[in-house]
């Protein structure tokens, strides 16, 4: 028996070790956006007396995950004793110790510089293309034109040839907080550029590519949004699960505000990364409510409402990703933009929704105007449409790329027992008839 127990323990230990080795909780693969990533392209455009001039471009190839205010911050470590002489379209957050330089003082002398985008309204002589939006980068599916950010950097003490120059290492990307893991810089084919008149092509002298992937677990240890449900055929409103994103009785006191005294909450600064939440049973910054509103003969209607419970954060260019099998029959969408993502090729069950520019693309902080809403009209497909067993509710919802906590399926609003839509077996009908006869006798 002892030998058998020892062998079993060894086998269990081996399986656990193999599992922990093979899978990690920080895995960045996203089934809805399998090829999504942020690619940083470092193009050396010319050589200088002691270094080079490069254009660094950040491409957000993620379909529905964007970088919101206060924007991205890009960092790295120099391989040698490089310095940044000057920058256009961006700036280092710290200059560092430049005391050994006389005359021209570098823009940054730190071994590990951190670069941020410039703000809108920057003078034109300090701008380049795709800069100066405060570090905000749109999702690729939402607005490809603004899913790019660039800056120009003049590097010294770095080498002046392809063989003497060294790529930066330990690249980090904050957007604006943690969540992204960046790989090493890889030498790739030089980038090619087309002149304004489209009659001439040029190319970089040398190009490095850095790929960064996102993990929600690395970004936040707890969820950031939850989903509540309701339907016209049931009086029950299913709330977000209790403690979806945290609990009020946590060890951190003062982390939420009673909505009755919300009017006296001091403004702690726009887009403060530290949340100040309204006290709720779910304690999530964002709640998405899905309400099955109406059923017509050939159509059915849903109302979607997004509510912000964070007094320290507003959301510009927000987006919502919803999985539901009836999106293939979406007929009309009111006051939101829509784009199918189709992660499974011909199966259209995933939709990306976002606000209309200058109308409702800005979700204000918690308060009377801290919500946006829309209605969706679906056509009924006789082969699959039903209100039974929670079919009318979404399978998954993402807000700004983060997976929201759904209520358990057994709590969904069900059809009332007397509904004609509930299929009744012949056995049940026969049993009811038999009991009725017995009562009459």
From Swiss-Prot:
Disulfide bonds: none annotated. Belongs to the COBRA family. It is found in: Cell membrane. Keywords: Cell membrane, Glycoprotein, GPI-anchor, Lipoprotein, Membrane, Signal. Residues 418-441 form a propeptide. It comes from the Eukaryota. Residues 1-28 form the signal peptide. Expressed in roots, stems, leaves, flowers and siliques. One of its GO terms (biological process) is plant-type cell wall cellulose biosynthetic process. InterPro entries: COB_C (IPR056900), COBRA_pln (IPR006918). The gene is COBL2. This is COBRA-like protein 2. Glycans are attached at residues 37, 162, 170, 209, 234, 249, 314, 329, 348. A lipid is attached at residue 417 (GPI-anchor amidated asparagine). It is a lipid-anchor; GPI-anchor. GO terms for cellular component: Golgi apparatus; Golgi medial cisterna; plasma membrane; side of membrane. The keyword Lipoprotein applies.
